[in-house]
């Protein structure tokens, strides 16, 4: 995973989606049109967190760079940067962090 010059703002997270499987367990090849949208990816960059209701301090995020996360199927904004595809998610779109 290469370093990216994108810094998310507030409670946003930059994720590179893990590739969806291209073959089934029985060996059938899945065409691109039939693939499920991936819901798992690696966190590439993390914003500083959002401000609390008083605006006095930032609330840090529960994820950090390098974490593998599971996120909402239709959450986030897809972007392309330097030929790579990324997803910018809000922290509330992240459903879980995968333990290693």
Curated annotation (Swiss-Prot):
Q: Which organism is it from?
A: Mycolicibacterium paratuberculosis (strain ATCC BAA-968 / K-10)
Taxonomically, the superkingdom here is Bacteria
So what family is this one in? Belongs to the GroES chaperonin family.
Which residues are connected by disulfide bridges in this protein? none
User: Where does this protein reside within or beyond the cell?
Assistant: Cytoplasm
Descriptive protein name? Co-chaperonin GroES
Which coarse location class applies to the principal site listed for this UniProt protein? cytoplasm
User: One cellular component GO annotation, for this chain's record?
Assistant: cytoplasm
